[in-house]
Amino acid sequence: MKTVFDIRIDFERSHGSFVFDKNTNEEFLDMFCMFSSLPLGYNHPVFDDSFDKKIQSLTRLRMCNNLFDSDELIDFKEAFKEISFHESIHFCSTGALAVESALKCAFEFKKNPAAMVLGIKNSYHGINGWGFMTDPEISSVKNRVIHFPQNDWRHYTLDDLIDYVRDSKEDIASVIVEPIQCTAGDIYLDINKLKELQ
């Protein structure tokens, strides 16, 4: 099977933001694979034997559900609530699945099949299901979804989005926001405008 890059990663010898390539016996700054899904980098010291022992059984069970509690899940929820802005927490396995879950909740709450999902231009919310539909114009997504069904969901600049939300609340099921836009480049949105949108 052909890969995009001719690199064979050695995960044991990779560290921080650097991947070690077995083919060339060199390390490379990883600017593609793990910048958002592995923010602590490869082989961070926090992932020691005690961490591995505690997390091992949970990773085998995929403890990402909201149907029942366990001591481990209760501990995690309490720790997470210390940094969360909201009392209610719903966990999902990936960011793309979290987007889908949030949109399903919005549609069920709104009960209006014609209601739109609004997004900020250049935002990327995953390729699963509805995630890509929030802004299919991003170059890395556009060619992949050109033959997919289209929708009337809109994407605006942050300023235009604020105006649209103010004037058209009844037509909106959800507004989905990516505060730091990585896929379209490092675009950091104005925190004050995000608060105004909220």
Locate predicted features:
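Glycine-rich loop-to-alpha-helix module at the N-terminal edge of alpha/beta enzyme cores
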Residues: 7-8, 27-111
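Short, acidic, Ser/Thr-enriched surface-loop or helix-capping motifs
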Residues: 21-23
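PLP-dependent aspartate aminotransferase-fold enzymes
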Residues: 75-176
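Alpha-helical transmembrane segments of integral membrane proteins
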Residues: 182-183
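Catalytic PLP-binding core of fold-type I/II PLP enzymes
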Residues: 187-198
